[in-house]
Regions:
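Residues in well-ordered beta-strands of folded domains
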Residues: 26-28, 54, 104
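Core segments of cupin and vicinal oxygen chelate
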Residues: 1-34
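Vicinal oxygen chelate
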Residues: 16-19, 39-123
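Short coil/turn motifs at secondary-structure junctions
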Residues: 32, 58, 106-108
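A short, acidic/glycine-rich surface segment
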Residues: 34-40, 110-112
Length: 123
């Protein structure tokens, strides 16, 4: 089962594509991505790069459940789901390749009927 609740649509030549309402996520092995950019780019895998991937959930319970699924799939929980300084609820995990993911719910967001994330009006 997919961690984010959406199964991958397809995998092609080592790239996994996940279609979400209004966007796509493409997961590509870091070595292959570096090679695609330039054979002269070294692959560095330690520390925090300053970049996270974020996924907005529909509820606090969804945040907890997604983090649990990530952990069951082998992810390392970095920050357990909790209330945030900005009024939301989020947690972080590091995936098997070491990328950091934030799973968050915020009171200022809402989902449209077709699943697109929007800012609430007058939020």
């Amino acid at each position: 089962e997919a961690v984010l609740g959406t199964p991958p649509n397809t995998s092609y030549d080592g790239v996994t594509f996940i279609e979400l309402p209004g966007t796509w996520i493409s997961l590509y092995p870091i070595e292959k991505l570096a090679e695609d950019i330039s054979s002269e780019i070294p692959v560095i895998r330690s520390g925090f790069s300053g970049v996270t991937l974020a996924h907005n959930a529909r509820s606090k319970d969804d945040v907890v459940n997604i983090i649990k699924r990530a952990e069951s799939a082998g992810a390392r929980i970095v920050k357990k789901p909790q209330e945030t300084f900005w009024g939301g609820f989020s947690g972080y995990f590091a995936d098997l390749d070491g990328y950091y993911w934030e799973i968050a719910w915020g009171p200022m967001f809402e989902f449209t009927e077709n699943g697109e994330l929007k800012f609430k009006e007058n939020a």
